[in-house]
Regions:
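Bacterial N-terminal signal peptides that target proteins for export
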Residues: 4-27
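Bacterial N-terminal signal peptides
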Residues: 24-36
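Alpha/beta-hydrolase-fold serine-hydrolase catalytic core, especially in secreted/extracellular enzymes
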Residues: 41-143, 232-235, 281, 295-518, ...
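Catalytic cores of nucleotide-enabled group-transfer and carboxylate-activating enzymes in metabolic
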Residues: 119-139, 150, 182-191, 195-196, ...
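Proline/glycine-enriched tight loop/beta-turn segments at coil->beta junctions
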Residues: 141-143, 150-158, 164-166, 516-519, ...
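Loop/turn elements at helix/coil->beta-strand transitions in domains of secreted/extracellular proteins
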Residues: 155-156, 191-193, 258-259, 281-285, ...
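Cap/lid segment of the alpha/beta-hydrolase catalytic domain
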Residues: 158-245, 293-301, 531-619, 665-668
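Primarily recognizes the serine-hydrolase "nucleophile elbow" in alpha/beta-hydrolase
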Residues: 248-319, 615-672, 676
Length: 770
């Protein structure tokens, strides 16, 4: 996607965009010191003086992040009030959060996985044998791993889950590099347990990308996470389903011979053990090692652990309460420390965000457990909190919780792998490809899901459509975008005149929205407005890494914006150029990382800012509140698709340089246009594909006018995607008898404001034909 910044066209090759933002911010600060001198005391009537001295764009981003930090801290208290509520509905809500929603196929037997060259029997221990196995999860997805089968009757049945970067062979003692004391699958088998060890998707980046087009440095876990998130699924949910499919087989085996079922995991496997035990009461006890801690810093962990809305209701202790009264053994051990994603290289461009896993202080783990005072949770400390996973004390506690007499866990020599030509990467690649193919099939099926969602509305007439879509609008705002309370502090408008041109005056405007969070922008007021006259307004929205001044400064002619707010003001429209908070690269993208666990997104804040803006604009004596339109480019086009459809205060919306088949755009593994290949991880919206696409959002505006502005050379998407998606809008508006209210203009040009057909559309639809 083209980054929108006024400085981009004049930057020398290789110039860092961050420096561009810093340069523009420095220019703003210089202007901020000069403008008050030239226009002292010149404010819009009924407002207070504007005295903000910092860059309002970056100040806005920082204010939102501070708001999220406060909300994250406050969420701990709110979650505590939920403990003890009905576990059944809570489990179902948690199941949806992690995307473990697909129906598993029955598992009545494991399949031995072997050939004449690579036998299924992998190794033999003193009292058990090891087999390579697979078991079905969905019709098109299997789990694979190792079965450690005791020679006698199993004393217990355990799913032993390794960290993502450990193979099953590591836990079984068949691979070098891990201390024998940490090989807890082998040690459980030596104690007479039947143990099933699944393969997890690892953190390398070998297959993350589109071969022959572009490869990325996203881990395999992130690559699957990105596409799955849009379809309401998750890498975590997929792997929990694999664990629970193993439990399904154990339960089937228990019909013939009953034995208690447990789960034990380390690192990413510890997460899966906790989540699986929370969801399935057939699991009699769980051992979680190298994972359990406070989740208030979830946004600093790898993005593939991001869960939409998790901290609204759950943290590790809340999940422990879902395990209760069954036992949860928490082992404080050294976490599988992760410094970040794989390094980018010339062959693998950086697309992955930062995210770390670090071992927390032992005191913080103790305090997290003490906070809940849960009788079912037992803490075991390995090596002062930095020892190996699967200590004898932890394994003993697990077996005792399953009412199995604990073995001595005396040291034994590990078995020897009898396979001569085994390559674990082939198995891992097969598992990776299955989950990618499964997710892409869900994406292809999502159009039917969307049709089912929108079939709840009545499109027999315009009136019935408006009334019947209100619940759907609420669902989109609350469940997909994330809804904040309506602005709840006085607007306290502050203004300062910064332009005095022959045809208009310009004012900086700042409005309070929530405590500590403000809206900012530039208002252009034509001088031709007569006393008592009320004019139409066009809200002119900048794009990614942009500033309001780039749209509304009469002395600036950006290659992207072409002074469109100024040109419209010169025609007689009142214009307002809001500052949106998608600026500062990772500085703003962390809003998404911090917000998603709270069921909030960047657009949760943008919607509130525009609520306040519409309220304020509508109260100005020279504004006709019934004629306020929206016109946005690029990320401003994304705003055009998400804000006016939900806010009735906008009389129309124009999406420039962004409209396309959004589901394909965010999930495609075939197209160079795909966000799967870029660093824009801020585009992720949980379950978006099953609820809406851009045509659905445009149709939600009916019968308000809607228009698309599209340059043939725009690299956001191909014309064919744009035309395909807009055809649905045109057909729907025609069905409602208002085809003249849906338009598209194609022009020869790039990612830019064209300002020809759109200006005519504004004049017509806002009834400004002078």
């Amino acid at each position: 996607m083209t980054r929108v910044s006024i400085l981009t066209p004049i930057l020398p090759a290789g110039r860092d965009l961050t420096r561009s933002v810093q340069t523009w911010a420095a220019m703003w600060l210089l202007l901020a010191t000069l403008v008050p001198v030239a226009h002292a005391q010149v404010t819009l009537p009924g407002t207070n003086p504007f005295n903000f001295q910092d860059d309002p764009a970056l100040g806005m981003v920082d204010s939102i992040r501070a708001f999220l930090e406060r909300e994250t801290a406050a969420s701990t208290t709110r979650r505590a009030t939920l403990q003890g509520s009905d576990a059944g509905p809570r489990r179902e809500r948690f199941r949806r959060m992690i995307g473990a929603v697909d129906v598993r196929v029955p598992v009545t037997a494991l399949q031995f996985d072997g050939t004449t060259a690579v036998p299924a029997e992998v190794a033999r221990g003193k009292d058990y044998r090891v087999f390579a196995v697979r078991w079905p999860v969905f019709d098109d997805v299997d789990a694979e791993g190792l079965l450690l089968e005791p020679n006698g009757t199993p004393r217990a049945r355990i799913v032993a889950i390794p960290d993502a970067d450990w193979s099953p062979e590591v836990l079984a003692g068949l691979s070098p590099g891990v201390d024998p004391a940490a090989q807890f699958a082998r040690r459980l088998a030596e104690s007479g347990c039947q143990v099933l060890v699944p393969v997890l998707i690892d953190r390398s980046d070998t297959w993350s990308g589109i071969p022959g087009m572009r490869m990325t440095n996203q881990s395999h876990r992130e690559w699957i996470f990105r596409m799955a998130y849009e379809s309401g699924r998750h890498i975590i949910g997929y792997e929990v389903q694999k664990v629970l499919a193993a439990v399904d087989w154990f339960a089937h085996e228990n019909v013939a011979h009953a034995a208690p079922i447990g789960v034990a995991g380390y690192g990413e496997g510890g997460l899966l053990a906790l989540y699986a035990a929370s969801l399935d009461e057939r699991v009699g006890a769980a051992l979680v090692s190298g994972y359990f801690q406070s989740r208030e810093k979830l946004w600093r962990e790898p993005i593939y652990r991001n869960l939409w809305g998790l901290l609204r209701e759950f943290d590790d202790m809340q999940l422990a309460s879902l395990v209760a009264p069954r036992a949860l053994i928490v082992e404080a051990s050294r976490f599988p420390e992760v410094a970040g994603p794989p390094a980018s290289t010339p062959e693998r461009r950086g697309a992955a965000p930062s995210g770390q896993i670090v071992t927390p202080p032992l005191d913080s783990i103790r305090s997290e457990i003490d906070r809940a005072n849960a009788a079912n949770v037992q803490l075991v400390v390995s090596g002062g909190g930095r020892g190996l996973p699967g200590s004898s004390e932890a394994l003993t506690a697990l077996l005792r919780s399953l009412r199995v007499s604990a073995a001595s866990f005396s040291p034994r020599d590990p078995p020897r792998d009898m396979r001569r030509e085994f390559d674990p990467s082939i198995r891992l690649h097969r598992q990776f490809d299955q989950l990618v193919a499964h997710t892409q099939a869900l994406i292809r099926a999502s159009e039917r899901k969307r049709q089912a969602f929108w079939s709840r509305a009545d499109a027999s007439s315009l009136d019935t459509w408006k009334k019947s879509t209100q619940p759907l609008r609420n669902y989109i705002w609350e469940e997909v975008i994330g809804r904040l309370p309506d602005p709840n502090v006085p607007a306290n408008p502050r203004t300062r005149m910064i332009y005095d041109e022959p045809k208009f005056r310009g004012y900086e405007v700042m409005l309070d929205v929530w405590p500590g969070v403000f809206a900012y922008g530039i208002l252009l007021v034509p001088k031709s407005i007569q006393p008592g006259e009320r004019r139409p307004v066009v809200v002119c929205q900048h794009g990614l890494e942009g500033y309001a001044r780039e749209v509304a400064d009469p002395k600036t002619d950006s290659g992207y914006y072409h002074r469109f707010a100024v040109r419209l003001a010169e025609e007689g429209f009142v214009t307002f150029a809001p500052q949106n908070p998608y600026i500062g690269q990772d500085r703003f993208r962390l809003i998404q990382r911090q917000g998603h666990p709270l069921k909030l997104s960047l657009f949760s804040f943008i919607l509130g800012q525009h609520q306040r803006l519409l309220e304020w604009l509508g109260g100005l004596s020279f504004v006709d509140r019934e004629r306020i339109g929206f016109y946005g480019l690029s990320y401003g086009g994304k705003t055009a698709m998400r804000v006016p459809p939900l806010l009735d205060g906008y009389a129309l919306s124009i999406c420039s340089a962004d409209f396309n088949e959004w589901v394909w755009k965010t999930t495609s593994i075939d197209s160079r246009y795909s966000y799967m290949l870029t660093q824009e991880y801020d585009m992720l919206e949980f379950d978006f594909a099953n609820v809406m696409n851009y045509s659905d959002l445009a149709n939600l505006m009916a019968g308000r006018p809607f228009m698309v502005e599209r340059g043939h050379e725009d690299g956001v998407a191909p014309d064919e995607w744009v035309a395909y998606e807009f055809a649905k809008v045109r057909r729907f508006y025609t069905h409602l008898g208002i085809p003249e209210r849906a338009e598209i203009e194609f022009f020869n040009g790039p990612h830019t404001i064209h300002g020809v057909g759109t200006f005519a559309f504004l004049r017509k639809q806002l009834r400004w034909l002078q």
